[in-house]
Amino acid sequence: TFGQAERASYDLAKDRVRLDGNAALRADDGAMLVAPRILYQRDNQKVIFPDGVELTQGMTRLVAPKGMVSLAVSDGPPEEIVLSGGVDVVTTVDATGALVEMWAKTVDSRRDPQGNWQVGARTDGPWITVRFTGGEDYFERTLHTLKMNAVIGPDGIISMQGDRGVCFQEIPFEGPPRSAEAETAQAWFSDGQLTDVELDGQVEVRAEQGVATGDRARLVQAGGLVMLQGDPTGRTRVGVESPRGRMSCDQATLYDREGRVEARGKVQGQLVDAQLLGASNTNLGGEPVRFAGETLEVIDKGEKFELRDNARVWQGHRLLVADDIRYDHSSQAVEARGHVRATFPAHEMDADASPDEDVVVVSRSLDYGGLVGRAVFRGSVHYSDPKHSLSANLLSIAFDDNDDISDVEAEGRVEIEDLEFGRRLTGQHALRDVESRTIRVTGSPAQLMDERGNIASGSSLTWNQADGTVSIDGGTELIYYPEEEPVAPGSPDDREESP
């Protein structure tokens, strides 16, 4: 170690050196320490800076009101550096020119066997602040914590950990700014530049108008995404909330730059300002749309949702179940694919129906347009309500301005059964008008079979449900089986049949 100063004094008895006036020490590894006054205790290999010190090594500079350096034996290079009183640190990342700035109340650094510095920072007042500026993908990233440990090598910071409470903010070149809070944080570096940050314990991440919570989160530099996980024991789940709604799941990935969210594992939640199959909009006093499934993808900043694997969506008395369900908020459109099952209130078809009774439609697919107020079911469609059942290739349900069912239209191998009186109507097309309480069936031909097996056919059948009559039009054909009156014992007819 080489030293210089304007004045120097040496205490032979105590083997100590004092340097005053622009004092400086240079170590063999290139570290430079500059201070107004330096006290060198050769007996215990310590250098004390009572009036402040500035330490420079490579691209790193540290400034503190007080400091102490412990040297290796025989006046070797520094092995430990303790700075206190409010420490400022500035490091330049050589590869990109990015800056790392830090403030802490106390900084304690020890050289490890690999030649790296194990740095610990503490504070009992203002939070420790580490600021990264000018990186590849971010204007600025800032870490606040009450306790910090880091490993610094010849090429810059290798890793960093925050403890006892952590706040993290970042402003990317692309995408919205975001912030996060947690109990602890672990940061990784490449060539001295911050890359990924992992947060642990009571995590909360905020971006634009949304907030996500979980037990653990990883903020990934590449792509600007956030990966959140819940507690494996199930005590804490991932939660995501925005003005569009909220949900919970086992794990989620937030793609802030794309405005997209992927959620997995027992996903459930609700949407506000949404409408399902003619149900009242929440702004009109209706209930929110609730959903559940194994996976969920949200795109276009919450405008579109895709729920997969045993998807369920419900609003009030309406329920939709399918393998996959897609929802577009702007058009209020719903698409369902695979094992579709939809449930509506039965009183929308029949005012006399009980509030607990349902209309159920089963099909392979469903397309619903909220703006046009029509739901179309396709593929092996089966419809049932308390008084009727229907099967067809296609079924279309229209909703009026009051969100009630106005008509039901069926196409392709239509079969309608009257569960009250045993009637069966078949044809190629059927239209049920709820207000007039009529069902019109057309086909080649359209047929009616009553409970006795009598058959009436024509080009069209109109069933008036109010009075129970059926009118037949166009090429009418009737097959009638008259009832035989029972034979009285001892009558002539009875004697003729007797042997």
Segments (PLM) and residue ranges:
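Mature-chain termini and adjacent capping regions
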Residues: 1-499
